[in-house]
Every structure is written in structure tokens, then in C-alpha cells.
Curated annotation (Swiss-Prot):
Part of the 50S ribosomal subunit. Forms a cluster with proteins L14 and L19. This is Large ribosomal subunit protein uL3. It comes from Thioalkalivibrio sulfidiphilus (strain HL-EbGR7). The keyword Ribonucleoprotein applies. Residues 136-156 are annotated as: Disordered. The lineage of its organism: Bacteria, Pseudomonadati, Pseudomonadota, Gammaproteobacteria, Chromatiales. Signal peptide: none annotated.
Length: 214
């Protein structure tokens, strides 16, 4: 894993390249991430950076977490996130340090993780991209039905993992290999090409792409 940043999705817009092409981009506000704990192999069993960002009223912070923030000497944030470290990565970073948007650069390939928009209970066509059955030719009840979901008395059950109707969305998911189009250090903004998971105002994790070439 690599050191990333926690940001907030502001929405989508577009930017124009020098040759006039229009690029759809997602705008992510990345306030400085404050390091609340540096986890070590000896004490915690693995190496990681724990960070927080944003602000939260003291009345909305639990006592254990308030003590954790106070021990780190940082302002209480809206949550805690971790970035696992490999080898000697992040050895120079100490508790209380700030990670800012300038750790990324234009043209870099990143992975973005967020909580997808909840869609409620959906059928197999929307949820699993099934094809519809015939609209006519004798079909009057099964236009959007999944079809067969099993066999006969043997095995006499529906196998686990069978794609069926159910709750869709509101899950943690990652979109990989997105390009950073622009880094606005003054306004703490990242402009990333394409769409990222989540609704406007949702928390997203931006990390260097694990499958990036080069």
C-alpha cells in the first residue's frame, strides 16, 4: 500500500485541454490530513499511518476518541482512516504532521475508494445487468424476471452467491487507474478524470494506483 489522502467529493465538472478537448472531472476537496498515530510492527503488528481530516464539534466526539486526538496533539476530525505502509515507507512522518494535496501531481494514476450511492432494493436487470426476456410472443408475466435459479430435487437448493434481486449500492468500492488532471494546492482541490464512487459530500480515499504502469 501507499500513502494517500482522505478527501470530500464536491461533484463533477469539466475542463478543457489545450487542444480543446472536454474532459469530465470529479472535484475532490482534500483538506490537510493530520497524522493521529504512526502504527509500528513492534507495537501494533503492522505499519500504518492513521489520519484525520476536517473538524468536528467537541460535543460530537466521544471521550476515548477525544483523548486519542489530544494525545496526538491534533484537532478532532470527522473520522479516522489508515494507510498501510510497506518497508521503510513514511519513516520520516511523525504524529501531528500534516499531509497535503501536493503529494499528488498532474498526470499521476490513482485509485479512489468511497461508499457507492444506495439504490435500495433492485431487480436483477439493474443490479446484475441481466437481459430482459421477451416483451411479447406469449410472455406476459416474466419480462424482468431472472429466469431459472436452480435445478431440480438434486441439489434441491439455490446455490450460495446466486445473482438475484436484492439491496444494491451503499457499499465500499474502489475505482482504479484514474488520472489526476489538476492539483490546486491553494484551494486544496484534486481534479480527477472520470467518476468516483459516492454522493456529493461523501468521504473518499485517494491513493497512488496499485496497477499503475511505469
Amino acid at each position: 500500500m501507499a500513502i494517500g489522502l482522505v478527501g470530500r467529493k464536491l461533484g463533477m465538472t469539466r475542463v478543457f485541454t489545450e487542444d480543446g478537448a472536454s474532459l469530465p472531472v470529479t472535484v475532490i476537496e482534500v483538506d490537510p490530513n493530520r497524522v493521529t498515530q504512526v502504527k509500528t510492527e513492534e507495537r501494533d503488528g503492522y505499519r500504518a499511518l492513521q489520519v484525520t481530516t476536517g473538524a468536528r464539534k467537541a460535543s460530537r466526539v466521544t471521550k476515548p476518541r477525544a483523548g486519542h486526538f489530544a494525545k496526538a496533539g491534533v484537532e478532532a476530525g470527522r473520522g479516522l482512516w489508515e494507510f498501510r505502509l510497506d518497508g521503510d515507507q513514511g519513516a520520516e512522518i511523525e504524529t501531528g504532521a500534516e499531509l497535503k494535496v501536493d503529494i499528488f501531481e498532474a498526470g499521476q494514476i490513482v485509485d479512489v475508494t468511497g461508499i457507492s450511492k444506495g439504490k435500495g432494493f433492485q431487480g436483477v436487470i439493474k443490479r446484475h445487468n441481466f437481459s430482459m426476456q421477451d416483451a411479447t410472443h406469449g410472455n406476459s408475466l416474466s419480462h424482468r424476471a431472472p429466469g431459472s435459479i436452480g435445478q431440480n430435487q438434486t441439489p434441491g437448493r439455490v446455490f450460495k452467491g446466486k445473482k438475484m434481486a436484492g439491496h444494491m449500492g451503499n457499499e465500499r468500492c474502489t475505482v482504479q487507474n484514474l488520472e489526476v488532471v489538476r492539483v490546486d494546492v491553494e484551494r486544496n482541490l484534486l481534479l480527477i478524470k472520470g467518476a468516483v464512487p459516492g454522493s456529493t459530500g461523501g468521504n473518499v480515499l485517494v491513493r497512488p494506483g496499485v496497477k499503475a504502469k511505469g
